[in-house]
Protein backbone atom coordinates (compact mmCIF):
# COMPACT_ATOMS: atom_id res chain seq x y z
CA UNK A 1 0.00 0.00 0.00
CA UNK A 2 1.19 3.52 -0.84
CA UNK A 3 2.04 6.02 1.92
CA UNK A 4 1.34 9.74 1.94
CA UNK A 5 5.03 10.36 1.19
CA UNK A 6 4.79 8.02 -1.83
CA UNK A 7 1.83 10.02 -3.13
CA UNK A 8 3.63 13.33 -2.58
CA UNK A 9 6.62 11.99 -4.53
CA UNK A 10 4.30 11.14 -7.44
CA UNK A 11 2.58 14.53 -7.29
CA UNK A 12 5.94 16.22 -7.83
CA UNK A 13 5.57 14.98 -11.44
CA UNK A 14 2.29 16.86 -11.97
CA UNK A 15 3.00 20.30 -13.44
CA UNK A 16 0.93 23.46 -13.72
CA UNK A 17 -0.39 23.35 -17.30
CA UNK A 18 0.14 27.11 -17.69
CA UNK A 19 3.65 27.13 -16.19
CA UNK A 20 5.04 23.66 -16.95
CA UNK A 21 8.24 24.04 -14.92
CA UNK A 22 6.50 24.16 -11.55
CA UNK A 23 4.74 21.25 -9.86
CA UNK A 24 1.40 21.38 -8.09
CA UNK A 25 3.36 20.86 -4.86
CA UNK A 26 5.76 23.75 -5.51
CA UNK A 27 2.79 25.92 -6.49
CA UNK A 28 1.19 24.78 -3.21
CA UNK A 29 -2.26 24.05 -4.61
CA UNK A 30 -2.15 20.60 -2.98
CA UNK A 31 -3.50 21.18 0.52
CA UNK A 32 -3.83 17.63 1.82
CA UNK A 33 -3.31 14.01 0.85
CA UNK A 34 -5.19 11.22 2.62
CA UNK A 35 -4.48 7.55 2.04
CA UNK A 36 -7.35 5.45 3.38
CA UNK A 37 -6.99 2.00 4.90
CA UNK A 38 -8.75 0.68 1.78
CA UNK A 39 -6.05 2.23 -0.43
CA UNK A 40 -8.25 5.07 -1.69
CA UNK A 41 -6.31 8.30 -2.13
CA UNK A 42 -8.00 11.67 -1.67
CA UNK A 43 -6.04 14.72 -2.81
CA UNK A 44 -7.40 18.09 -1.73
CA UNK A 45 -6.46 21.10 -3.85
CA UNK A 46 -7.14 24.83 -3.60
CA UNK A 47 -7.45 26.98 -6.74
CA UNK A 48 -4.96 29.79 -7.17
CA UNK A 49 -7.97 32.02 -7.76
CA UNK A 50 -11.69 31.45 -8.26
CA UNK A 51 -12.37 30.29 -11.78
CA UNK A 52 -8.77 29.33 -12.59
CA UNK A 53 -9.10 27.32 -15.81
CA UNK A 54 -6.04 25.23 -14.99
CA UNK A 55 -7.64 23.58 -11.94
CA UNK A 56 -9.65 21.05 -13.94
CA UNK A 57 -6.54 20.11 -15.89
CA UNK A 58 -4.54 19.79 -12.66
CA UNK A 59 -7.22 17.55 -11.13
CA UNK A 60 -7.23 15.34 -14.23
CA UNK A 61 -3.42 15.20 -14.31
CA UNK A 62 -3.29 14.29 -10.59
CA UNK A 63 -5.71 11.40 -11.14
CA UNK A 64 -3.84 10.25 -14.24
CA UNK A 65 -0.44 10.28 -12.49
CA UNK A 66 -1.71 8.26 -9.54
CA UNK A 67 -3.68 5.75 -11.62
CA UNK A 68 -0.66 5.21 -13.88
CA UNK A 69 1.29 4.24 -10.76
CA UNK A 70 -1.18 1.59 -9.65
CA UNK A 71 -3.55 3.52 -7.43
CA UNK A 72 -6.99 2.28 -8.40
CA UNK A 73 -9.16 4.65 -6.37
CA UNK A 74 -8.37 8.37 -6.56
CA UNK A 75 -10.53 11.37 -5.69
CA UNK A 76 -9.51 14.99 -6.13
CA UNK A 77 -11.47 17.51 -4.09
CA UNK A 78 -11.36 21.29 -4.33
CA UNK A 79 -11.62 23.52 -1.27
CA UNK A 80 -11.79 27.31 -1.28
CA UNK A 81 -10.87 27.96 2.33
CA UNK A 82 -8.34 28.97 3.30
CA UNK A 83 -7.89 30.96 0.13
CA UNK A 84 -4.65 30.23 -1.73
CA UNK A 85 -1.92 32.85 -1.57
CA UNK A 86 1.30 33.33 -3.52
CA UNK A 87 3.08 33.27 -0.15
CA UNK A 88 2.62 29.49 -0.23
CA UNK A 89 4.72 28.98 -3.37
CA UNK A 90 7.87 27.15 -2.29
CA UNK A 91 11.32 28.68 -2.62
CA UNK A 92 12.12 26.02 -5.25
CA UNK A 93 8.96 27.00 -7.10
CA UNK A 94 9.94 30.68 -7.08
CA UNK A 95 13.42 29.81 -8.31
CA UNK A 96 11.95 27.73 -11.15
CA UNK A 97 9.59 30.57 -12.11
CA UNK A 98 12.54 32.96 -12.34
CA UNK A 99 14.62 30.50 -14.38
CA UNK A 100 11.61 30.09 -16.71
CA UNK A 101 11.55 33.87 -17.25
CA UNK A 102 8.62 34.69 -14.96
CA UNK A 103 9.25 37.14 -12.13
CA UNK A 104 8.18 35.33 -8.94
CA UNK A 105 5.73 37.07 -6.61
CA UNK A 106 6.82 39.13 -3.65
CA UNK A 107 5.30 38.42 -0.26
CA UNK A 108 1.72 39.67 -0.05
CA UNK A 109 2.62 41.52 3.15
CA UNK A 110 5.02 43.78 1.22
CA UNK A 111 4.83 47.23 2.86
CA UNK A 112 4.82 48.98 -0.54
CA UNK A 113 1.64 47.15 -1.49
CA UNK A 114 0.05 48.04 1.84
CA UNK A 115 0.82 51.72 1.15
CA UNK A 116 -0.63 51.49 -2.37
CA UNK A 117 2.77 52.04 -3.99
CA UNK A 118 3.78 50.38 -7.23
CA UNK A 119 5.75 47.18 -6.75
CA UNK A 120 9.40 46.91 -7.66
CA UNK A 121 9.71 43.82 -9.86
CA UNK A 122 13.23 42.67 -10.73
CA UNK A 123 13.78 41.44 -14.28
CA UNK A 124 14.13 37.63 -14.26
CA UNK A 125 16.57 37.87 -17.20
CA UNK A 126 19.16 40.39 -15.99
CA UNK A 127 18.13 41.18 -12.40
CA UNK A 128 17.61 44.91 -13.03
CA UNK A 129 15.01 46.69 -10.91
CA UNK A 130 14.54 49.28 -13.67
CA UNK A 131 11.29 47.73 -14.89
CA UNK A 132 7.84 48.96 -15.83
CA UNK A 133 4.46 47.25 -16.00
CA UNK A 134 3.03 47.28 -19.53
CA UNK A 135 -0.26 45.60 -18.65
CA UNK A 136 -1.90 44.17 -15.54
CA UNK A 137 -2.95 41.31 -17.80
CA UNK A 138 -0.28 38.88 -18.99
CA UNK A 139 -0.29 35.56 -20.79
CA UNK A 140 -2.60 34.13 -18.11
CA UNK A 141 -4.93 35.77 -15.60
CA UNK A 142 -2.46 35.20 -12.76
CA UNK A 143 0.34 37.12 -14.50
CA UNK A 144 1.06 40.74 -15.47
CA UNK A 145 3.21 41.87 -18.41
CA UNK A 146 6.36 43.85 -17.61
CA UNK A 147 9.37 45.18 -19.51
CA UNK A 148 12.94 45.69 -18.38
CA UNK A 149 14.26 49.14 -19.30
CA UNK A 150 17.87 47.89 -19.18
CA UNK A 151 17.89 44.65 -21.20
CA UNK A 152 14.62 45.63 -22.98
CA UNK A 153 13.15 42.14 -22.52
CA UNK A 154 9.43 41.77 -21.84
CA UNK A 155 8.53 39.30 -19.09
CA UNK A 156 5.59 38.00 -17.09
CA UNK A 157 5.27 38.60 -13.38
CA UNK A 158 3.30 36.18 -11.23
CA UNK A 159 0.81 38.49 -9.48
CA UNK A 160 0.74 38.58 -5.69
CA UNK A 161 -2.49 37.14 -4.38
PLM segments and residue spans:
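Short, non-transmembrane amphipathic alpha-helical segments
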Residues: 49-73
